Design a protein with these regions (language model features):
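Basic/aromatic-rich interaction segments and small domains that mediate binding to polyanionic partners
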Residues: 1-5, 10-93
Length: 93
């Protein structure tokens, strides 16, 4: 695993769906944003490949938390949003 609980990460600011058919599980509102790994979920077949019946190598999946203020300009509270993200979408900031 590349990341551990507590690690700060940034989400790739990539839009593969603009280049052609794609099945993307990474929400648009977290792309290009910074968060923190809060749980390692294990390795699972990559759904971006499974959706097109391609061989799907296992990829590490994480729970990453983002402060609402990181995602939206005027959040109603100091809450956080937890998103499941595959490792290939994450980088060290």
């Amino acid at each position: 695993m590349k990341f551990s609980v507590g690690d700060e990460v940034s989400v790739r600011n990539d839009w593969p769906e603009k280049r052609g058919p794609a099945h993307i599980r990474t929400p648009h509102y977290v792309r290009g944003r910074r968060g923190r790994v809060v749980k390692e979920l294990g390795a699972f077949p990559n759904p971006e490949d499974l959706a097109f019946a391609r061989p799907a190598a296992p990829r590490q999946l994480y729970h990453v938390t983002f402060p609402m203020r990181e995602l939206w300009p005027d959040p109603a509270s100091n809450d956080e949003v937890v998103v499941e993200l595959y490792e290939h979408w994450l980088a060290a900031p």
